[in-house]
UniProtKB/Swiss-Prot annotation:
Pfam families named in the record: DUF3139
Organism domain of life: Bacteria
Alphabetical keyword list: Plasmid
Protein name: Uncharacterized 13.4 kDa protein
Function according to Swiss-Prot or TrEMBL: Possibly involved in pGI2 replication mechanism.
Source organism (scientific name): Bacillus thuringiensis
Matches recorded under InterPro entries: DUF3139 (IPR021486)
């Protein structure tokens, strides 16, 4: 019985640690882009069961209202992508739309880090 309890505690601790690490890494990336936390609107953060790791989608105040930013954390690395979607869908946290081209990504108010 005690072994089962210890196993459960270890698994929960591991999952929570990974979640905290992912969120911390993503928010560090966001800060290095020059974005303040107060600019983040319509935040959606969750485990990405399909690809593994964690995923954060957010609208950044001051950016084009039809563009949202997506950050993914996997294997201790943060990846960034931005998408066109309607402002209405973004406000409802209905993520989707079409990805920006490399040229469009460079024109973002907060482009990806090098």
């Amino acid at each position: 019985m005690m072994a089962i309890f210890i196993s459960i505690v270890l698994v929960v601790s591991f999952v929570l640690f990974n979640r905290v690490q992912a969120k911390k890494s993503i928010y560090n990336y966001i800060a290095r882009q020059g974005i303040q936390e107060s600019q983040l609107k319509y935040i959606d953060f969750h485990k990405d069961f399909k690809m593994g790791g964690y995923w954060l989608a957010v609208y950044v105040e001051g950016e084009n209202p039809d563009i949202y930013y997506e950050y993914s954390y996997q294997d201790k690395k943060v990846n960034f992508q931005a998408y066109f979607n309607s402002e209405k869908a973004i406000k409802k946290k209905m993520w989707g739309g079409s990805g920006l081209t490399e040229i469009e990504m460079k024109k973002l108010k907060y482009p990806p880090l090098q």
